[in-house]
């Protein structure tokens, strides 16, 4: 059994009726085998008083850093990410019509592997900023459904790391 004790965490509760003092309180977080066991102040002292063998507990001092649930990106086009790097894909005028034209030309020769490779880079960047839930649109105007196939494969491959919801576009 693995046990971690995260001490000195600033917990963002966001609970209705919470006072400023309650939402700013420093708490400790006890995790056993990847499951939250307890969130309370002074857990280390409590565990020691209960006779817990602290030698087997990994203690991480968060130094008052904010701890909150992961973020959700509710509108992303993972099949489009980094396509502007392809020759001829840049929307020079910045207009919607040119953007649509450039994408139409760019997607014609995209492969499942290429979309997955670029999407993985985009997902990694999202995760580094605290995002764990992503709702991505998939272009379904391609008769081969290349984008949809790529993103559905990626959803399955990354299911233990990030939650992907795929919607058609």
Residue ranges and their predicted role:
Residues 16, 59, 164-166:
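Generic structural signal for residues in well-ordered beta-strands
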Residues 42, 83, 138-139:
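Short, ordered loop/turn segments at secondary-structure junctions
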Residues 30, 38, 59-61, 73, ...:
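Short, conserved beta-strand segments within well-ordered enzyme catalytic domains
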Residues 98-109, 118-146, 159-169:
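Divalent metal-dependent hydrolysis catalytic cores, especially in the metallo-beta-lactamase
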Residues 82-115:
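Active-site gating loops and adjacent loop-to-helix segments of metal-dependent hydrolytic enzymes
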Residues 1-52:
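N-terminal metal-binding scaffold of metallo-dependent hydrolase/deaminase domains
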Residues 151-161:
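Acidic (Asp/Glu)-rich catalytic clusters
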